[in-house]
Swiss-Prot record:
HAMAP family to which the protein is assigned, alphabetical: UPF0434 (MF_01187)
Name used for this protein in its record: UPF0434 protein Oant_3286
Any one GO CC term of the record: cytosol
Family: Belongs to the UPF0434 family.
PANTHER family (UniProt xref): PROTEIN PREY, MITOCHONDRIAL, ZGC:162634
Organism: Brucella anthropi (strain ATCC 49188 / DSM 6882 / CCUG 24695 / JCM 21032 / LMG 3331 / NBRC 15819 / NCTC 12168 / Alc 37)
Annotated transmembrane regions: none
A matching Pfam family: Trm112p
Origin superkingdom: Bacteria
Amino acid sequence: MDDKTQTGNIDVRLLELLVCPLTKGPLEYDAEHGELISRKAKLAYPVRGGIPIMLPSEARSLTE
């Protein structure tokens, strides 16, 4: 894949389809931490081996 279709380890097309399982809101990819961020739920879902782990029990709580 080229740079236009991939962001770090996440395919941009996949990122456009994924939503937070709790809020159904959009996600942002944080390449530095390898996480998908749900601002609305204040959770960070891990990405392991290029695979998003979309389980709330696996998510890290974001603190402000």
